[in-house]
Every structure is written in C-alpha cells, then in structure tokens.
A protein has these predicted regions:
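Extended, intrinsically disordered, low-complexity segments
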Residues: 66-105
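Alpha-helical scaffolding segments of alpha/beta enzyme cores, especially the outer helices
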Residues: 15-19, 43, 90, 94
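Glycine-rich phosphate-binding active-site loops on the catalytic face of alpha/beta enzymes
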Residues: 1-5, 47-65
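Alpha-helix-loop-beta-strand connector modules within alpha/beta enzyme cores
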Residues: 9-30
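Short glycine/threonine-rich loop-to-helix capping motif typified by GTGT followed
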Residues: 8-13, 41-45
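Glycine- and other small-residue-rich loops at beta-strand/loop junctions that grip anionic moieties
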Residues: 5-9, 30-33, 55, 84
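Alpha-helical structural signal in soluble globular domains
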Residues: 19-23, 43, 47, 65, ...
C-alpha cells in the first residue's frame, strides 16, 4: 500500500510561501503533509496555502477502520466498509477544522 512516509522531518519555508503568495496573488496548494505538525499546517494556511492535498492520514484511518471492523466481527468487505468510512470521516473532519475550512465554500 503506497504511503508518503518521510525519512526525515519536513521543513516548510514559510517565508517562501508568503513571497510566492504575494507575488502571484493565486491560491497555493500544498501537496502532501506527511510529517508536518498542526502548527506547520496552520502557519502554511496563514501564509497563503488554500488547498492541502493529504492522503496518507486518510489512508491510515481507512486501515484502522478495517482493523476495527475485523475485531468487531465484520466478516465481509461490505461489512467492513462502514468502519473504514467512519474512521476516514473522522480524519477529514479533523483536517477541515485544522485548516480553517469548516463552513467555508
């Protein structure tokens, strides 16, 4: 299962994000966030990041959901899906709050 696990902690150049945002006036995208702290995400958003592409955390949540479903006795894929979705939704809700995206279009 492919996941973006980093071998060393990432370090965002926040001043560069600010400069790019100021010079382009365009919404900026952060592709990936594996290894970033909540502070890093909040700072990046405050400096001009408008969209964050995340997969690894959601993927891991899906795996946890499947594991919970198996532990609860769900024996079919259809039985596991609700567990997977529940865990993934929780991570998405958490990220939406972290990124300041709740109740925003």
């Amino acid at each position: 299962m492919p996941t973006a696990i980093t071998s060393c902690p990432p370090k965002l150049d926040f001043d560069r994000i600010s400069a790019i945002s100021a010079s382009t006036g365009l919404p900026l995208v952060l592709h990936g966030g594996s290894g970033l702290s909540d502070h890093d995400f909040r700072e990046a958003v405050s400096r001009g990041i408008c969209k964050v592409n995340i997969f690894t955390d959601i993927d891991k949540a899906g795996k946890r959901g499947i594991e919970k479903g198996l532990a609860a006795g769900a024996g079919t894929m259809m039985g596991l899906i609700p567990y997977e979705i529940q865990e993934m939704k929780a991570v998405v809700r958490e990220k939406l709050t972290l990124f300041g995206s709740v109740n925003r279009a």
